[in-house]
Amino acid sequence: MVKDVISNMNVHMGKSIESLRKEYQKVRTGRATTSLLDDIKIDSYGTLSPLNQVATLAIPEARTITISPWDSKMIAPIEKAIMNSNLGLNPANDGKMIRLVLPPLTEERRKDIVKQLKRDAEEAKVALRNIRRDAIDQLKKLEKDKSISEDELKRAEKDVQDSTNSHVAKVDEVLLHKEKEVMEV
């Protein structure tokens, strides 16, 4: 029973960290990555489709993304969707493909991005603490129901805290890595 609670908690904490990593992939660092465009939806024949389902995305250079639509009629809707995305990118259209050149980030913009990264990391830590609280509540309920002894509860609470500490350290590690990437000129 105790192992189930701790195992379940670890799974949820792992998902929180994975969610943070996915969020960080969407952050612009001055280096081109197709994940910047993951949230862009294109009006494709009456339905909203993700950009990668209507075009081929490529990164020919460090700060350039090319978008080659499978249907040339999709160039205008793709261009419009990118302009409306608040990514601060200006698409250049040559009739067959769209080029996105990522401008270099200013020092001020880098600092703003780092502040946002820290906010996201703090939200992830709050989520981890909430998961820890839920696990401890479940353990206390087991003890109250006499399913586990007080000693087992104390041992399990220590395991929960150790696991939480290790997951918080992972969040800090992910933050530090992304922070370095953003501040790198």
UniProtKB/Swiss-Prot annotation:
Pfam families assigned to the protein according to its UniProt record, in alphabetical order: RRF (PF01765)
Gene3D superfamilies: 3.30.1360.40, Ribosome-recycling factor (1.10.132.20)
Cellular-component GO terms for this entry: cytosol
Entry keywords, A to Z: Cytoplasm, Protein biosynthesis
GO molecular-function term, one example from the UniProt record: ribosomal large subunit binding
Single Gene Ontology BP annotation: cytoplasmic translational termination
Cross-referenced InterPro entries: Ribosome_recyc_fac, Ribosome_recyc_fac_dom, RRF_sf
The UniProt record lists the keyword Cytoplasm: yes
Top-level taxon of the source organism: Bacteria
Keyword hit for Cytoplasm: yes
Subcellular location: Cytoplasm
Function: Responsible for the release of ribosomes from messenger RNA at the termination of protein biosynthesis. May increase the efficiency of translation by recycling ribosomes from one round of translation to another.
Family: Belongs to the RRF family.
PANTHER family in alphabetical order: MITOCHONDRIAL RIBOSOME RECYCLING FACTOR PSEUDO 1, RIBOSOME RECYCLING FACTOR
Name of the protein in its database record: Ribosome-recycling factor
Native species: Geobacter sp. (strain M21)
The encoding gene: frr
